[in-house]
């Protein structure tokens, strides 16, 4: 029976994730596997490659043939060089350790405690129908006009009409 070490595709569309498996050469790409011996995630930075070196060495020793992509992965991990007797490759890149969430939270809390609190940078939204600022402005303008109209009877009629127009213009239209 011809045995191959190859990749089976898992994951979602545009988010591939592969398993390194040992399978019969006649099975489908994602068909039944004899054994899963590793994982490969190309979307992470740096790419995640996990291989069970003991099982890879066993399957290569009994004659399993790796496909080209798997052979490249085994060269990166150094398993292919161990099998063929070649010198070891340079070490793989490793992901930087993630910062401790508790330490980040404490640092942010200390930073926030030292800063003086200020007003919000954006103003509050006004309510849609009743704009208080618009209602008070015409009324404030009407009061001085009414006082002036009491002093001048001839010009008072026109200013009172203007003040009434100003209040009717300021009312919100439904």
UniProtKB/Swiss-Prot annotation:
Keyword Ribosomal protein on entry: yes
Listed Low complexity bias regions: 135-158
Gene3D superfamilies the UniProt entry points to: 3.30.1320.10
SS bond list: none
Pfam families (UniProt xref): Ribosomal_S16 (PF00886)
Basic and acidic residues biased stretches: 98-118
Biological processes per GO annotation: translation
Biased composition (Pro residues): 87-97
InterPro entries per the UniProt record, alphabetical: Ribosomal_bS16, Ribosomal_bS16_CS, Ribosomal_bS16_dom_sf
Segments for region (Disordered): 81-174
Compositional bias annotation for Polar residues: 160-174
Taxonomic superkingdom: Bacteria
Annotated GO CC locations: cytoplasm; small ribosomal subunit
Keyword Ribonucleoprotein in record: yes
GO terms of molecular function: structural constituent of ribosome
Keywords: Ribonucleoprotein, Ribosomal protein
PROSITE patterns: RIBOSOMAL_S16
HAMAP family reported for this sequence: Ribosomal_bS16
NCBIfam families: PRK14520.1, S16
The family this protein is said to belong to: Belongs to the bacterial ribosomal protein bS16 family.
Name under which the protein is recorded: Small ribosomal subunit protein bS16
Gene name, Swiss-Prot/TrEMBL: rpsP
């Amino acid at each position: 029976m011809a045995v191959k070490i190859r990749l089976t595709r898992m994951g979602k569309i545009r988010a591939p994730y592969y398993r390194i498996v040992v399978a019969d050469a006649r099975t489908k790409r994602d068909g039944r596997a004899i054994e899963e011996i590793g994982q490969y995630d190309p979307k992470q930075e740096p790419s995640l490659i996990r291989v069970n070196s003991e099982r890879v060495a066993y399957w290569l020793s009994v004659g399993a043939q790796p496909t080209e992509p798997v052979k490249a992965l085994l060269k990166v991990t150094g398993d292919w060089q161990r099998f063929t007797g070649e010198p070891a490759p340079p070490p793989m890149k490793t992901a930087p350790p993630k910062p401790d969430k508790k330490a980040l939270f404490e640092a942010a809390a200390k930073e926030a405690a030292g800063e003086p609190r200020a007003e919000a940078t954006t103003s509050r939204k006004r309510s849609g129908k009743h704009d208080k600022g618009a209602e008070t402005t015409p009324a404030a303008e009407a009061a001085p006009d009414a006082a002036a109209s009491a002093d001048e009877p001839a010009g008072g009629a026109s200013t009172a009409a203007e003040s009434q127009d100003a209040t009717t213009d300021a009312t919100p239209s439904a």
